[in-house]
């Protein structure tokens, strides 16, 4: 359980990075085992590779990047330069901005190979850092996660039609070779509620050996609906999935989740603090929650979610989802029936983008502010390749057609003539 979709996305990136580090460390160990009896001089290409990686290293003292890389390369054990022992570089991702307090999003994850250390050690590997690849439609928290973890800025693929097209993702991935990748797809975009083509994106991620994360904070509850769950085909192929029931789950904040296929996927979060999860206590059966969250001090947010699931069940939530999706489609039909209004596109979830026919961006923004200032309606705004649109995000499963007509009447009444 997390504070919301933002923290879930950040946690997904953290797990992807830790998975990458572990894979790289395993490869390094295998190389050291293989080459331990056959010392060899570094080739020019190897030295150039280290220089490239060293450019990403955070320096300390007066060392140059090459000084640091060379010390890690030789394992700082007095090993002659010609020996391949101890390939190491400092992990740039282990350095992020500090935050006060105990309940923040930690940017220095504990490494489970040292389960009893009080502070997270720095992980080391010679490979390049994790590279995130996402669409321009991705939530801003994906970019923030890269910043928090000290990763390179995400490669952002244009999404002119609002979804991440497989051909565009393939072109981007083809230019990213020799580095670990995390492909991020979205199931319910912030602007329009659009859903990326998950099966095709999952195929591409697998073909390029990339991790696959789906941000389903908005659209994830379609899984409850027998009518609409097909829109999330391919979600089961993700390594991590973000869900947030404060959106289309009718929960007060916070109500976020990060879902993984297997509890063992959360192993990088393992941490030992004797006063919380001493070995003998956990062996005796006491619950250990440190490996299930980045936060130690947290509210019992799971309680309200558990009560809702218990009271409504799968069918009850599915009914609310279906009713709300139907209301959004009704609103879209009502917009199309009025010559004075234009619809951006048929809704996928419960977000409807529309505006007065022919209205420019200034007019759309003015209408929205007037409705808000007068206390008549709260509409969002969304900028697409075709300009600015009013955004109606429907979350009331009991909205009636007359309610929706009244909203459109208000928009028309506040449109400058």
Segments predicted by a language model, with ranges:
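Conserved PLP cofactor-binding pocket of PLP-dependent enzymes
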Residues: 346, 351, 374-391
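Active-site C-terminal subdomain of aminotransferase-like
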Residues: 233-339
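Conserved PLP-enzyme active-site core in the AAT-like
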Residues: 8, 14-20, 119-264
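PLP-dependent enzyme catalytic core of the Aspartate aminotransferase-like
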Residues: 208, 384-417
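PLP-dependent aspartate aminotransferase-fold enzymes
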Residues: 1-41, 45-110, 114-179
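Conserved PLP-binding catalytic core of the aspartate aminotransferase-like
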Residues: 342-371
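A common structural junction motif
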Residues: 371-379, 411-417
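Short beta-strand-to-loop capping motifs
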Residues: 260, 354-358, 394-396
């Amino acid at each position: 359980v997390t504070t919301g979709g933002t923290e879930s996305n950040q946690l997904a990136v953290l797990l992807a990075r830790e998975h990458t580090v572990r894979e790289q460390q395993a490869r390094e160990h295998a190389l050291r085992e293989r080459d331990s009896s056959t010392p060899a001089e570094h080739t020019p290409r190897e030295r150039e590779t280290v220089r490239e990686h060293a450019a990403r290293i955070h320096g300390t003292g007066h060392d140059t990047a090459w000084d640091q890389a060379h010390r890690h390369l030789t394992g700082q054990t007095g090993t002659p330069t010609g020996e391949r022992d101890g390939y190491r570089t400092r992990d740039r991702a282990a350095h992020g901005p500090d935050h006060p307090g105990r309940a923040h999003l930690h940017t220095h994850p504990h490494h489970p190979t040292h389960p009893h250390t009080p502070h997270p050690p720095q992980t080391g590997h010679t490979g390049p850092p994790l590279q995130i690849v996402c669409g321009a439609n991705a939530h801003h928290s994906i970019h923030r996660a890269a910043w928090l973890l000290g990763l390179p800025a995400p490669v952002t693929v244009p999404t002119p039609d609002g979804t991440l097209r497989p051909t565009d993702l393939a072109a981007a991935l083809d230019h990213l070779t020799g580095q670990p990748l995390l492909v991020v797809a979205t199931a319910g975009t912030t602007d329009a509620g659009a859903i990326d083509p998950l099966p095709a994106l999952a195929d591409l991620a697998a073909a390029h050996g990339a991790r696959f994360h789906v941000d389903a904070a908005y659209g994830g509850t379609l899984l409850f609906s027998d009518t609409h769950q097909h829109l999330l085909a391919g979600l089961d192929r993700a390594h991590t999935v973000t869900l947030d029931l404060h959106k289309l789950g009718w929960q007060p904040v916070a109500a976020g989740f990060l879902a993984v296929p297997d509890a063992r996927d959360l192993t990088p979060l393992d941490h030992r603090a004797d006063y919380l999860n001493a070995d003998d206590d956990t062996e005796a059966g006491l619950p250990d929650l440190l490996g299930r969250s980045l936060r130690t001090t947290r509210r019992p947010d799971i309680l309200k979610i558990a009560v809702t699931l218990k009271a409504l069940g799968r069918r009850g939530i599915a009914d609310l989802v279906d009713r709300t999706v139907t209301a959004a489609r009704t609103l879209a039909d009502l917009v199309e029936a009025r010559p004075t209004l234009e619809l951006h596109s048929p809704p996928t979830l419960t977000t409807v983008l529309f505006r007065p026919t022919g209205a420019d961006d200034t007019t759309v923004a003015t209408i929205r502010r007037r409705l808000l200032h007068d206390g008549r309606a709260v509409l969002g705004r969304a900028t697409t390749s075709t300009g600015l649109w009013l955004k109606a995000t429907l979350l009331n499963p009991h909205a009636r057609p007359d309610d929706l007509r009244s909203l459109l009447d208000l928009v028309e009444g506040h449109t400058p003539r």
